[in-house]
């Protein structure tokens, strides 16, 4: 995400605007001087610091490698970088960047997560019961996503929550575990989630809860969405 996905500046629906229109087929390629490794059958099959990062609209962020470092792995040439090729993500068993295992795609150097303590209010109700009503929150500003509030468990009626088997992964916040709300026999699955072991930049929300407005009655005091001057509300 970030540059070409979501509402990133090079996406088809940017949050901001440029002085002149950008071409629809715009591709941004840049050096990515980090150690990237690929493991297959227990063997390191790629180990390079010469990868490129390719940002292409409607495509996941991807690495391009010098053709001479990919061996017999399947590959396709990168038209915007002669001599470089793409290797399918599932062609190997594991990808590493600077020793960190990657799950879905490369981490985006333009993606940022800011966690700020705030006094913005959050009220969450499920089946008529209030789970949280507090202004002691942390607001998370994440590139290309809407701001979101998190709260520590001490201000939540956690007795009405129980863990589910759902788990998801974010390249920037880590693994999320989910919670169901149980209120007088009514069960709403995956109404909340927590990141129990986030990376250092997200430690302010470690163990904190955020709630899904599509599954609960959530009233959150969030910043107004920005828009270009002259656009109608």
What residue ranges belong to the model's regions?
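Terminal leader/tail segments of proteins
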Residues: 1-233
